[in-house]
């Protein structure tokens, strides 16, 4: 009886294992028990798309015809279109290009060599003429020697006389002559120190006179107030006159 019960249990376990075996799995097949992933045929005829979410969502074509797109429409502006005529700028172009310039170009660029006021095709100095007809040189281009390169280096010392006028800046006339200039170290230059020493006594006397005049004005105002106070005290209309009158109140100015 026990043997029959054991056989029944063994057959049940074998059936359960057989249900989950790779042979019965729909993915089984081929080497290693794994079948290759086969894309499903799309019978609707539409393109397959995949939507990618995230920071930059986008739609990716994943079907077999993802590279086939609609051709772009014909544009109005092409490389053969005359943009001046298309935007109606021919009149403005002729107006500004035919205007005579008051000052020549050489007045703005005096150090530029060659004749730059006229058009370049007259003396074959335009860029097109140089490209079409390059200059014929008898020698090859050689690197500069150390002596020649010394002319491009900065040397210590003062600037030569012929170049000083290029860097000279016209001096400005100060409108406020009495304005006091502040210096970084608090010391005036030598040219102004001599002038200050010469006029030191005069400025001291002027300052003393101004201070004395201010004190005299202050003393005069004080005497005038005292005189006015005494006059009000002895007047009959003043309420403080008499023996039983109240003491005069001092006024604070």
From Swiss-Prot:
It is found in: Nucleus. Residues 21-40 have a biased composition (Low complexity). One of its GO terms (molecular function) is transcription coregulator activity. GO terms for cellular component: mediator complex. Keywords: Activator, Nucleus, Transcription, Transcription regulation. Residues 18-49, 157-253 are annotated as: Disordered. Residues 165-183, 220-233 have a biased composition (Basic residues). The keyword Nucleus applies. The keyword Nucleus applies. InterPro entries: Mediator_Med19_met. One of its GO terms (biological process) is positive regulation of transcription by RNA polymerase II. Belongs to the Mediator complex subunit 19 family. Component of the Mediator complex. Component of the Mediator complex, a coactivator involved in the regulated transcription of nearly all RNA polymerase II-dependent genes. Mediator functions as a bridge to convey information from gene-specific regulatory proteins to the basal RNA polymerase II transcription machinery. Mediator is recruited to promoters by direct interactions with regulatory proteins and serves as a scaffold for the assembly of a functional preinitiation complex with RNA polymerase II and the general transcription factors. This is Mediator of RNA polymerase II transcription subunit 19. It comes from Aedes aegypti.
């Amino acid at each position: 009886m026990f043997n029959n019960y054991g056989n029944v249990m063994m057959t049940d376990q074998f059936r359960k294992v057989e249900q989950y075996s790779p042979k019965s799995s729909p993915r089984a097949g081929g080497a290693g028990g794994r079948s290759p992933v086969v894309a499903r045929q799309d019978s609707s005829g539409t393109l397959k798309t995949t939507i990618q979410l995230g920071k930059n969502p986008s739609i990716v074509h994943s079907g077999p015809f993802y590279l086939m797109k609609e051709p772009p429409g014909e544009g109005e502006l092409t490389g053969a279109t005359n943009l001046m005529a298309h935007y109606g700028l021919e009149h403005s172009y002729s107006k500004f290009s035919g205007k005579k310039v008051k000052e020549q170009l050489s007045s703005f660029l005096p150090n530029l060599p060659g004749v730059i006021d006229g058009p370049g095709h007259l003396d074959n100095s335009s860029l097109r003429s140089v490209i079409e007809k390059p200059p014929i040189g008898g020698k090859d281009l050689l690197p500069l020697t150390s002596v020649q390169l010394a002319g491009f280096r900065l040397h210590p010392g003062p600037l030569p006389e012929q170049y000083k006028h290029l860097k000279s800046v016209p001096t400005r006339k100060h409108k406020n002559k009495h304005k006091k200039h502040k210096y970084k170290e608090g010391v005036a230059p030598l040219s102004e120190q001599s002038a200050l020493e010469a006029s030191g006594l005069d400025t001291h006397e002027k300052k003393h006179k101004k201070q004395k005049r201010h004190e005299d004005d202050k003393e005069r105002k004080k005497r005038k107030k005292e005189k006015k106070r005494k006059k009000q005290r002895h007047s009959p209309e003043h309420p403080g006159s008499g023996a039983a009158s109240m003491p005069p109140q001092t006024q604070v100015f």
